[in-house]
């Protein structure tokens, strides 16, 4: 989270699920909807979560050193456990949703 706040990133893209074949694949690094979490001096809250077909879009509120900013968090949920998606249409829709957010800041993937 320090990297996100230092570079004032406004978009995070996640291309994996949390679990694959029953094994943890990725740590959940954001709190549940409406909840707050603290990571050192950084406070984080999930203020919105929308399931859109093959992805989830979240709005995160992050506060560090008295400064608050919002982060668009996109999680692609249709990547198969092994291999690549059979069709590319879901991935194209996901990409389009991400690129609709206009930013000059780094996108965290």
From Swiss-Prot:
It is an enzyme of class 3 (hydrolase). Residues 1-109 form the Tyrosine-protein phosphatase domain. Keywords: Hydrolase, Protein phosphatase. Its EC number is 3.1.3.48. InterPro entries: Prot-tyrosine_phosphatase-like, Protein-Tyr_Phosphatase, PTP_cat. It comes from the Eukaryota. One of its GO terms (molecular function) is protein tyrosine phosphatase activity. It catalyses: O-phospho-L-tyrosyl-[protein] + H2O = L-tyrosyl-[protein] + phosphate. The keyword Hydrolase applies. Substrate binds at residue 81. Belongs to the protein-tyrosine phosphatase family. This is Tyrosine-protein phosphatase 16.
